[in-house]
Regions:
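Short, surface-exposed helix-loop/turn micro-motifs enriched in polar/charged residues
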Residues: 91-92, 145-147, 203, 291, ...
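N-terminal glutamine amidotransferase
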Residues: 1-71, 75, 107, 116, ...
């Protein structure tokens, strides 16, 4: 878990560094920032890093040989496969994030347009070009290469030659990415809304309508947040932004690159299909054990976490990896879930960390 943040419009390194400082709890292993003045306004990017792969390398922001800049939060599970397919790219790191820049260079950079000063119109809380929501908009050209990524991510990529900022989230929206447009047209974005508080022009106001929806349905129905004019970048979505002649951020494109529809099978054969399901889950666990640091499993004692813990053991044994430790928290040593977790940990000979919380501590 890293923390990324940035500004397109009225900002500087002092402000973006403070914004990133508000996310230091997400990434204590390193900090980096980038600032570039534009004709009017500026682009600022920053990251607080939690190092998981390529511990001593892969510092961010990462700059590519085609002069694009990236900050990313997440993991790209198929980065080794992508690296093997893009052999002519001058790799600077052994980490996973750089594959985003390599794909951008190969599929988007060579056929890109020249920079044109956008004409934006205020639509709700945003400033958009007239074609931003139409097929063939600026974000559409990135669908093919982003679709090659397998993982979880929220990233921001700045292309200085056409002054284009790409904001993107993974298909399931595992990694967060929020944005807001200030009254002067400045775009703020980050892994947490908390980062916006460091910008002197941001004013946190409640969104009463969004709050009412949460209370009624207990989950959001759209991409609004409890803060007025602060929204999430949608899962499986690419947004492209640029800056106009007045230094205001303009949305030039928005597109979904992933719209998979998962429907229940009409006929379920447990003798055949259960093995397919288990193999898929095994492959998913195998991908998520990609790490240069120790990995652990939170073991509640329920079916889901028990499956993950058991498969982690099997994957580790087959790959010669260190078996992940498991952790269980309960309010009582005789809690049924704790007993189930102990039983599973003993069965698989897992290093089990048990924490009993005294109920009196809650008062």
């Amino acid at each position: 878990m890293c923390g990324i943040t940035g500004i397109l419009g009225n900002g500087d390194s002092t402000v973006v560094n403070s914004m990133s400082g508000n996310l230091s709890h997400r990434g204590p292993d390193g900090f980096g920032s980038f600032e570039s003045d534009l004709v009017v306004g500026s682009i600022c990017l920053a990251q607080s890093r939690l190092a998981i792969v390529d511990i001593n390398g892969s510092k961010q922001p990462i700059e590519s040989e085609h002069n694009c800049i990236l900050v990313q939060n997440g993991e790209i599970y198929n980065f080794q496969k992508i690296k093997s397919e893009i052999q002519n790219y001058p790799w600077k790191t052994s980490g996973d994030s750089e594959t985003i820049l390599a794909l951008h260079r190969k599929y988007a950079y060579e056929n890109k347009k020249t920079y044109e000063i956008p004409v934006g119109k205020k639509v709700g809380s945003l400033i958009k070009t007239k074609d931003a929501d139409k097929p063939g908009n600026d974000a559409d050209k990135h669908r093919s290469w982003v679709s090659k990524l397998d993982g979880v991510w929220g990233f921001a990529l700045w292309d200085p030659q056409i002054r284009e900022l790409i904001l993107c989230r993974d298909p399931m929206g595992v990694k967060p990415l929020f944005r807001t447009l200030l009254p002067d047209g400045t775009l703020l974005f980050g892994s947490e809304i908390k980062s916006f508080y460091a910008h002197p022009e941001f004013q946190a106001k409640p969104d009463i309508n969004a709050l009412a929806v949460r209370l009624a349905f207990e989950y959001p129905l759209d991409y609004t947040t409890l803060f007025s004019n602060v929204t999430s970048v949608a899962q499986g979505t690419i947004e492209t932004w640029t800056i106009d002649k007045e230094g205001k951020a303009v949305l030039t494109g928005i597109t979904r690159y992933n719209q998979e529809k998962v429907s229940p099978e009409g006929n379920w054969n447990p003798n055949l299909d259960a093995e397919i399901l288990l193999k898929s889950l095994y492959n998913g666990v195998e991908s998520r054990l990609m790490s240069d640091v120790p990995v652990g499993v939170v073991l509640s004692g329920g079916l889901d976490s028990s499956l993950i813990a058991g498969l982690s053991k099997k994957v580790s044994d087959s790959k010669g990896l260190e078996t992940p430790d498991v952790w269980t928290v309960a309010g009582d040593e005789n809690n049924p879930d704790m007993l189930a977790a102990i039983s599973l940990a003993e069965h698989y000979e897992l290093n089990h960390h048990k924490k009993i919380i005294d109920p009196e501590k809650f008062w």
